[in-house]
Amino acid sequence: MEDKKEEGESEIQEHGPEHWFSKWERQCLAEAEQEDQPEEEAEQSQQKLWHLFQNSATAVAQLYKDRVCQQQGLSLWVPFQNAATAVTNLYKESVDAHQRSFDLGIQIGYQRRNKDVLAWVKKRRRTIRREDLISFLCGKVPPPRNSRAPPRLTVVSPNRATPTETGSSVETDLQPFREAIALHGLSGAMASISVRSSTPGSPTHVSGSSNTGRRRNGLHDVDLNTFISEEMALHLDNGGTRKRSSAQCGDVITDSPTHKRNRMI
C-alpha cells in the first residue's frame, strides 16, 4: 500500500503545474523570484536626510548663540548665511527624497503584483479563463459558470397562436392606449358619448325606420374607460381577435350616401 501511495505522489509531482512550463518560462520565473527590493536606496536616502537635518539644526543653534553673545565688531551675516544654506539644502533634499520614495513605492508595488500573479498562475491549470484573470486582478469573485445549453426551438403554426401568446401580445399592444386614456382624463370628458352595446350575433340589417329606432334604443351613455375595459376583457376571454360579421359591417355603413338616396326616394 505504501509503495502504491508513493508511486501516485510521484506521478502527481511529474504532472504537476511546475512541469507545464517550458525552460524559458522557468528561467523567467526564477529571475522574478530573485529580484531584490531596493531597500538599500531607501536607507541611503534616510541617512542623507538625517545628516542634512543635523547640519541645519547646528547652523540655527549657532546663529542663536552668536546673537545672544554678540560682541562688538562681529557681524551676524555669516552665521545667518550658513543657517539659511543648511535649511535650503534640507528642503531640496526632502523634495527629492519624497519623489524618489514615491517612485520606489510604485516599483515595489509592481514587483509585488507580479509575484502574486506568478504565484497564482503556478496554481492554475494550463489554460486560464479570462474572467478568472480579471477577477483576480480586480480582487473580486469570479461569476458563476452556467452550463450553456442549446436553445430549444418550438415550431408554431403561423395561422394559429396559443391563447397565452395572443393575450399577452394584445395586452402589450393596447397598454399605451390605456395609459393615454388614463393620463389625459378622457373617461370624464367623454362620458356623454353614445356607444353601441348590442349583444354579438343579433341581426342588425333591417329596414330604415326600424333600424333607426333599434339603434337609438340600443345606444347608452357609458363611461369610455369602462367600455374599453369591458371590450378588452371580452376580447381576451375569447382567446384572440374577433372578426366582425357582414351584418355588423352593413350596420356601420347605413349612413352612406347610397342609403340616404334610397330613403329620399
Swiss-Prot record:
Transmembrane segments: none annotated. Keywords: Cytoplasm, Nucleus, Stress response. InterPro entries: HAPR1, HAPSTR1-like. Residues 156-170, 195-212 have a biased composition (Polar residues). It holds the Pfam family TAPR1-like. Residues 1-22, 145-170, 195-218, 240-265 are annotated as: Disordered. Signal peptide: none annotated. It is found in: Nucleus; Cytoplasm. Belongs to the TAPR1 family. Acts as a central player within a network of stress response pathways promoting cellular adaptability. Functions as a negative regulator of TP53/P53 in the cellular response to telomere erosion and probably also DNA damage. This is HUWE1-associated protein modifying stress responses. The gene is hapstr1.
